A protein has these predicted regions:
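Short polybasic amphipathic segments
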Residues: 1, 71-83, 148, 172
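Active-site bordering "gate/hinge" segments
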Residues: 1-52, 56-69, 76
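Short helix/loop capping segments that flank catalytic or ligand/cofactor-binding pockets
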Residues: 8-11, 18-21, 60-63, 82-84, ...
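Short, glycine-/Ser/Thr-/acidic-enriched flexible segments
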Residues: 15, 56-58, 79-80, 87-88, ...
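Generic structural signal for beta-strand residues in well-ordered domains
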Residues: 44, 73, 104-107
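Extended interaction regions within the primary functional domain
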Residues: 45, 49, 113-115, 152-156, ...
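Dual-mode signal for accessory low-complexity, basic/Gly-rich regions
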Residues: 66-67, 82-152
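Intrinsically disordered terminal and processing segments
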Residues: 145-172
Length: 172
């Protein structure tokens, strides 16, 4: 359990562990410049617990901005079941709800890739330093050393069947 209240558990093995090191050197390897992280997707339905975003965490997709107020997520059977907080929670709820294809569609609320930043050249404060242009920061914000990347939505990159535009990436 983290000091902020994050207490998330999940099983792995259904999907591969993927690395991004900044260049594609073999056929079929997805990568982008500024890489330096490792991630995987939890087994379907296995994620349970609580995730808490704190001020200073980064919503890299879709907004490319720092979190301003705490957001608490409750996760059961691989899906977010509750989003509590202020403006940042409302932004997340609205974005994920808008990504649904029907009232029964839960895909935007599914836990997607989870990873860790490992690039000593990536800067947590890059958005504050250079502005919030997504094309400049989406890679580096995912890879600054020590972050845990939490995301929702699609899992097709890892071989899954969930393809939704309701995608959220938050390096914490």
């Amino acid at each position: 359990r983290s000091a902020s209240g994050t207490d998330l558990s999940y099983d792995c093995g259904e999907y591969p562990v993927m690395t991004q090191w900044g260049y594609a050197d073999e056929k079929g390897h997805f990568d982008h410049w500024g890489g330096g992280h490792i991630h995987t997707f939890p087994n379907e339905g296995s994620a349970h617990g609580t995730v808490v975003f704190q001020p200073g965490d980064i919503v890299i997709l879709p907004y490319c901005r720092y979190v301003a107020d705490p957001v608490k997520l409750e996760i059961r059977e691989g899906h977010i079941t509750q989003i509590d907080g202020g403006m940042d929670a409302k932004l997340m709820r609205d974005w994920l709800n808008d990504g649904r294809e029907s009232d029964q569609d839960r895909d935007p609320f599914a836990v997607s890739h989870l990873g860790w930043g490992m690039n000593p050249q990536a800067l947590w404060y890059g958005i504050a330093l250079h502005g919030d242009a997504p094309e400049r920061h989406r890679a580096a914000a995912r890879t600054f050393p020590g972050n845990f990347l939490f995301s929702t939505g699609p899992n097709t990159q890892g071989g899954g069947k969930r393809n939704t535009r309701g995608h959220y990436d938050v390096p914490m």
